[in-house]
UniProtKB/Swiss-Prot annotation:
Keywords: Cytoplasm, DNA damage, DNA repair, DNA replication, DNA-binding, DNA-directed DNA polymerase, Magnesium, Metal-binding, Mutator protein, Nucleotidyltransferase, Transferase. It comes from Shewanella sp. (strain ANA-3). InterPro entries: DNA/RNA_pol_sf (IPR043502), DNA_pol_Y-fam_lit_finger_sf (IPR036775), DNA_pol_Y-fam_little_finger (IPR017961), DNA_polymerase-Y (IPR050116), DNApol_IV (IPR022880), IMS_HHH_1 (IPR053848), Rev_trsase/Diguanyl_cyclase (IPR043128), UmuC (IPR001126). One of its GO terms (biological process) is DNA-templated DNA replication. Residues 4-185 form the UmuC domain. Binds 2 magnesium ions per subunit. HAMAP family: DNApol_IV. GO terms for molecular function: damaged DNA binding; DNA-directed DNA polymerase activity; magnesium ion binding. It is an enzyme of class 2 (transferase). Its cofactor is Mg(2+). This is DNA polymerase IV.
Length: 359
């Protein structure tokens, strides 16, 4: 058993803006697209969420829900700098840190001797340090496995904490909605619901082999998570897994020819980014992404060990076959990166070591 903490900053980008510009406090605020150009909300504060505004929502729709919504373009460099401050705080407690984004990370504190090894007290201390040194609040989840730590961090937001001790895992997962399991999105949840599967308890009672036959490898993962099993360790590799570029179009486009006109600029920018951040890395796939005007999206990928411009156009044609008459509002291209030959695989830690838990 391990002691895993998942730290998730509360409405991070918006919180930084409210910290630096007090006039925004207490007012609905969103970081993202402007009123003039089309775009999407990156994040918003809790005042905006009361009106139904959410991350990844079209800016125009968000303004309909909340006409007084304050929109700011965002300051990514500032967000990165604050994230580095937070990362430095994590390092005081453990070297086993897996960043998921600028505002969240997993920490394995199994060997941390502070607070007599209590993961609960360690999480509280980390949150206190973050607040004292950055002026921002964080929520935390503490559990013996990764996915439950992430679930727990969302239960007492904002500025809260939830602990799931090892002896409570089995009971906790029984009533857990399958939507809380990573990989179970809306479409998968609907498929599971059609089988009468809505909670982990439902999966526990369902024939395992039938789930595997229906869902393949994901069926195996689903059964494990539903039983409170997650043997993934903390990955401390910092290598990028992909490089991509995408653009939200000023107006919807509808034809393959229109999309093809957008591609050269995307491919050129992708080439530049590969040169800057992935020089010498081998690729293992190419990907084209389309987002439609109903905000659903599709991706087409092709396994390859070299970048082919022709293949990007072929993938675009395949993606357009899924258009179904919808307008296209976003187009993106990316490549998946193989591990560097001179680096080790991500360090997977504490898979089997048994520890005395002090939660």
């Amino acid at each position: 058993m391990r002691k895993i903490i998942h730290i998730d900053m509360d409405c991070y980008f918006a919180a930084v803006e409210m910290r630096d510009f007090p006039e925004y406090r207490g007012k609905p605020l969103a970081v993202g697209g402007s009123r003039v150009q089309r775009g999407v909300i990156s994040t918003c504060n809790y005042e905006a969420r009361k009106f139904g505004v959410r991350s990844a929502m079209a800016t125009g729709y968000a303004l309909k829900l909340c006409p007084d919504l304050i929109l700011v373009p965002g300051r990514m460099q500032v967000y990165k700098e604050v994230s580095q401050q937070i990362r430095a705080i994590f390092c005081r407690y453990t070297e086993l840190i897996e960043p998921l984004s600028l505002d969240e990370a997993y920490l394995d504190v199994s060997d941390c001797k502070l607070f007599k090894g209590s993961a609960t007290l360690i999480a509280e201390a980390i949150r206190r340090d973050i607040l004292a040194e950055t002026g921002l609040t964080a929520s935390a989840g503490v559990a013996p496995i990764k996915f439950l730590a992430k679930v727990a961090s969302d239960l007492n937001k904002p500025n809260g904490q939830c602990v799931i001790p090892p002896d409570e895992v089995a009971e906790f997962v029984k009533s857990l909605s399958l939507r809380k399991i990573p990989g179970v999105g809306k479409v998968t949840a609907e498929k599971l619901s059609s089988l009468g599967l809505n909670t982990c308890a439902d999966v526990q009672a369902y024939p395992k082999q039938e789930l595997i036959a229906r869902f393949g490898k994901f069926g195996t993962v689903l059964v494990e998570r539903a039983h409170g099993i997650d043997e993934r360790g903390i990955s401390v590799s910092r290598e990028r897994k992909s490089v991509g570029v995408e653009t939200t179009l000023a107006q919807d486009i509808y034809t393959l020819e229109q999309c093809q006109q957008v591609m050269p600029g995307l491919i050129q920018e992708l080439s530049s980014r590969l040169g800057r951040s992935a020089k010498g890395r081998q690729i293992h796939k190419q990907v084209v992404k389309l987002k439609f005007n109903d905000f659903k999206q599709t991706t087409i990928e092709h396994r390859s060990d070299e970048v082919s411009v022709v293949m990007f156009y072929e993938l675009l044609s395949q993606a357009m076959a899924r258009q179904e008459g919808r307008g296209i509002r976003l187009l993106g291209v990316s490549v998946g990166l193989a591990e560097s030959k001179d680096t080790l695989s991500p360090l997977m830690v504490r898979e089997t070591k048994q520890l005395d838990f002090v939660f």
